[in-house]
Amino acid sequence: MKSKVFMVLLLTMALMVGTVGIASASGIFVFGTSGDAVRLDPGNVTDNESMERMDNIFECLVGFKPGTTEIQPWLAASWDISSDGKEIVFHLRKGVKFHDGTDFNADAVVFSFGRQYDSNNPYYQYGEWALWKALLGAIEKVVKIDDYTVKFVLRRKNAAIITSLTMMYAVAIVSPTNAEKYKEDAFKHPCGTGPFKFVEWVKDDHITLEANENYWGGKPKLDKLIFKVIPDPSARLMALEVGEIQGMEYPNPGDFNRIKTNPRLKLLTAPGMNIGYMAINTGYGYKDANENGVRDPDEPWVKTPGYFEPLTKKKVRQAINMAIDKQSIVDNIYMGTAIKAKNGIPPFMLGYNDAIEDYPYDLERAKALLAEAGYPDGFEVTLYVMPVSRAYMFDPPKIGEAIQSYLAAVGIKVEFYQLDWGTYLQEVEAGKHQMCLLGITGDTGDTDDFMSICYAPNSAAIGTASNRAFYNNEEVQNLISKSLQTYDKAERAEYYKKVQEIIHEDAPWVYIAHANQNLVFSATVHDFVISPTSRMFFYPVWIE
């Protein structure tokens, strides 16, 4: 314990030396984060670390009113949807400039979307466009009508399309001129229309943004916004206490009393639209989505690199679910700042199936299921453990240790596999894991955000998978597809409830917890509004 405290002190002292004077300057805000960004291209990322930075650099056609999931205009001033739901015309905001001084217009919108779906586009080669394929494959094309009007033509009606256009991932508008200048390195030099402009990125240390004085919404109150990487939450809190940073994410729940009793700090907390899970690689994915963002019917299912025969068996996956005491994890690791999960969507979302009974913590039944599956003595398996804290999982190593202990009790020996964050994501998207810790924070407020990204077989393409269990139940895919063909919420809810029933039976995930959002700020920081989707918008923030 003494050595751990000493290392935390050393880390904090190093931080103070490296950033001395930054926090004391007027209008400079330093936010402590658990990990670095992977890329700064909204079309080509799936991680929240990257998105936290880009929330302040880029903008979408539509967005949410602060603190809600109520849709409002953003770079689009208005829009019209055809009666059959297959065409959407957006009327764009005029007088908006990119950070490089070029105009935001219809050409920029067509470019930002076209590079993701048009394989003949010269910029298509620079990305994997994973979330386009997962959520936006219904878009056939985006066409320019005039300089400030664009039309989205859909292949099929999609009830979630407008909410999907709020999520920053895949749909934020980038500067075509900047993309042409930097080509495959554009993700290192982001250029949007947002309230802050990119200045520098020192890998694994910090990203600096500065106020966009020509921002169409008015200049931000902050002069500079710095995202400082401090992986250890105790070190982040110490840095906040001594004034080297003004805000931080993912505090240790055990430090809440310390935070609440410090008059120089304030804790912001709200329910999280998230799920933390352990994905069990069921063994089969497919090579790539077609131009519609879906798997062709004749595309074969092939073994993933992490194929492991025991995990392909339903009874084994059910046994794993029964061997893990999730309530203990919530009580002792989340320390009551989360609720135990039994389904893959939060309880307040459309279609949540509360009638499902969670797998009980039952070691004897788990052992019996393993024996029935042909593994009475268990087996050895690897678990990928995230190197960073997330909104849905505050302390992945501790959760991994708990799972390791629980599964050992039924004869399953778990070996940890740890990588840097960027490599971790690449390997689980490629299906190299046997089991992995991950999760999702909803970006759109729509249940489809969870269903199409996490649970749909169409999202199990090896190399870009967001369905990290590589779960390939075709009935589930059909139900998710049907849910997007109607605007009737009751009908959509029934489809989602059925999906949850099927997934519960097949058990490709261990759903662990729905965590609260927890952020800590200096008491001198004002007007930060927690987003239900965990977005990090610092535009309105000011410091006394």
List each model region and its residues.
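Active-site-proximal polar cores
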Residues: 512
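Bacterial N-terminal signal peptides that target proteins for export
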Residues: 1-9
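N-terminal lobe/hinge region of extracytoplasmic solute-binding protein
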Residues: 32-83, 114, 191-192
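Long beta-strand-rich cores associated with HINT superfamily self-processing modules
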Residues: 519-544
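Extracytoplasmic/periplasmic ligand-capture domains
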Residues: 21-24, 64-67, 86, 93-123, ...
